[in-house]
Curated annotation (Swiss-Prot):
Residues spanning the membrane: 248-255, 258-265, 375-382, 388-395
Ubl conjugation recorded as keyword: no
Domain LDL-receptor class A: 117-159
SMART domains documented for this protein: LDLa (SM00192), MACPF (SM00457), TSP1 (SM00209)
Oligomeric and partner information: Heterotrimer of 3 chains: alpha (C8A), beta (C8B) and gamma (C8G); the alpha and gamma chains are disulfide bonded. Component of the membrane attack complex (MAC), composed of complement C5b, C6, C7, C8A, C8B, C8G and multiple copies of the pore-forming subunit C9.
Assigned protein family: Belongs to the complement C6/C7/C8/C9 family.
Extent of the signal sequence: 1-31
Membrane topology: Multi-pass membrane protein
Lineage of producing organism: Eukaryota, Metazoa, Chordata, Craniata, Vertebrata
Domain EGF-like per the UniProt entry, residue ranges: 501-531
The protein's name in its UniProt record: Complement component C8 beta chain
The species this protein was found in: Oncorhynchus mykiss
Glycosylation sites: 62, 65, 547, 550
Keyword hit for Transmembrane: yes
Amino acid sequence: MNHKLKPTVGLGYCLLCAALCLLLLRDVAIAGSGEEPSGVREARSVGTQVAVQPVDCVQSEWSSWTRCDVCRKKRYRYAKLVQPSQFGGEPCHVQGKEVEPCSPPSRYDCTHDETPLCEGFLCTYTGRCVPIDLRCNGDDDCGDWSAEKGSPKVPKACKQEAQEYHGIENLAKGINILHSHLEGSVIDNRYYAGSCLPHYIQDVRFRKPYNLQQYTLETKGTYDFKLQSFESYSEFVHYTMTERSSKTTVSIGFALPGVAEFGFNYADSKYSKSEKKIRRASRKENSFVQAKAELQLARYILKSEDLMLHPEFFLRLRALPQSYNYGEYRQIYRDYGTHYITEATLGGDYEYTVILDKEKLEKTGYSLEAYKNCEQIVLKVGANIKGVYVTVGLEGGGCDGLLNEMGEDTVKGSMVEDYVAVVSGGDSESITWLAAKNLPTPPLMRLWGEAVHYNLDFIRSVTRPLYELVTARDFSSANSLKKNLRRALAEYLEESSSCRCAPCRNNGLAVLKGTRCECVCPSGYSGLGCEITQRPDIGIDGSWSCWGSWSPCRGRSKTRSRQCNNPAPSSGGIACRGLQMETTDCF
């Protein structure tokens, strides 16, 4: 079915974080027969001979050199990734870009590009236009201190000292939606436009940056856990994807290639460890009980217009050529990310999942719902409550019998196959305690909550593409610059998508890191392609291929499609989720 894209896409389709880790599970079955070519790696998989063929990295020819960057005094050329290396294949030994020093013509300088008329003070180096009354006020309103030069005596900007909002610098950074990394600063959250109006939060004086519409502290959430139970792996994946999609939205203007690959930070060990355990549990005989606790401590909202850009980002945009060159525009996204954060809820959350052996649970005579209810009681009273009589409507008068079966710490009983914890916010010590193979106690939860106040993480956020920061106020050629940035974003996301990797075996997840693909294997599986195991066969979940080429423009729109064959679902695995065909506006 053909769907018209909406301007805002849920993070389930853009930033799936841990949910996508549970969903896009890949398979490559390369059966060995006859003579094996050189470089093929052999392995055993439940008595079946399999082979993984190395794939070498291939890059395109070099582009021509760009013009000399007048600000950086460098010029660039690039090569695009044609085929990433995988399964031990030969890597690419170049980074896909080359930079060399150059001398721009003397008639050009870093602020030469045409700028809109400034009716205030035009900053010497950054080219920023600020109100004339900001001169000699003690603030670095220009980003280069030029508005303070020549002042007889530089006073303090404000008579009273004020604190800076927690996490304000991270909120000024761009974010790369391919892997959720924060990159260089794109807006200037230390620009105040001369304002010294105090903003008091719990008797603490803060100074509000110009770009902010709202920054409030709010204590929402408790140390109580919300529990959900799932009879099967597919139910668990569907719920997790839907629940996480409500937490973050990413506006992109067009759909993303390999949409479900986005948002998961594969370099983060806490996610990769949980990923391996969950994928191992994709067999039909597993059930799941998941618990979550969330603390919301602050809310951040940007102004909707007239944002003050960070001076370095501002100069980089000014130095881009008006004629489109993918190499230079791609470098912007590598250095500053693809999006900026317009709204965010900050705090911390703790999520754990108990993976149960369904057959052993059924043999105890208790239901999955009974297990969930008893686990809720364990959490409310604070861990080892074996022998404590609590009525929860179970036949037999309480949880005593089931707690004996569950084990003293609930997650160590014979019916528990594994336990997965992912904690965000707080400090490393509290996170280490919480992620241990024990249910969290109320004292540990309080300790973690106190640490979250000093190390906030993103709980929910809304982002917009970087090109929306380009306005006619700052750029005389805003329309063409925005058009080029939007075009480059589409190319960059397509070039960098993990859908370009060959599928891994046994629900391993193929991840594109630079120019090479790696397989994140479920627990109990190993090898370059997750091909080595003594475990029985499991259902293989489907994953999307890359998007095909766009159709010719018809009117003002064009379409493209993709297939659920990378790999196709088999043996009862989950089908691909999301659109098979999409429509977007023509550039």
